[in-house]
Amino acid sequence: MTVSCSKVLLSLCLFLILLEATHESNQQRTNYREFSEIQLAQETREINEKNNQLLNQQLPRLNRRKRLWRDEDRRTFCTTLCPCEDRRKRAAVTPPTRKVPCCCP
């Protein structure tokens, strides 16, 4: 009876040691995963901030280019579709529409 009790206690102790080691291993894995996720989020945030800075620097130039394209389109539209005899009226008084060209009053 004494031998079997000591074997049971030994088995129980080994099981508890193994359980504790498994728990520590799982905890380390969880900590590493959380650390990796935090690090990835931080790197992503830094990359996004850098990209946003570049876009914010380029935005005025892009808006200017867009405005120039719009003006160029209006000039082309008024020049090619203006039915008015007086070409000086091409200076877009009203925005162009499909029905009425911009150079007409």
Curated annotation (Swiss-Prot):
For this chain, the family text in UniProt reads: Belongs to the scolopendra neurotoxin 10 family.
GO function term, MF aspect, one: toxin activity
Instruction: Quote the protein name from its UniProt record.
Output: Putative neurotoxin 10
**UniProt keyword Cell division, yes or no:** no
Q: Which residues form the signal peptide?
A: 1-21
The organism's place on the tree of life at top rank: Eukaryota
Where is it predominantly found?
Answer: secreted
Which species is this UniProt entry from?
Scolopendra mutilans
Tissue-by-tissue expression: Expressed by the venom gland.
Is Cell inner membrane found in the keyword set?
no
Q: Which GO terms describe its cellular component?
A: extracellular region
Q: How is it modified after translation?
A: Contains 3 disulfide bonds.
Q: Where in the cell is it found?
A: Secreted
Q: Which UniProt keywords apply?
A: Disulfide bond, Neurotoxin, Secreted, Signal, Toxin
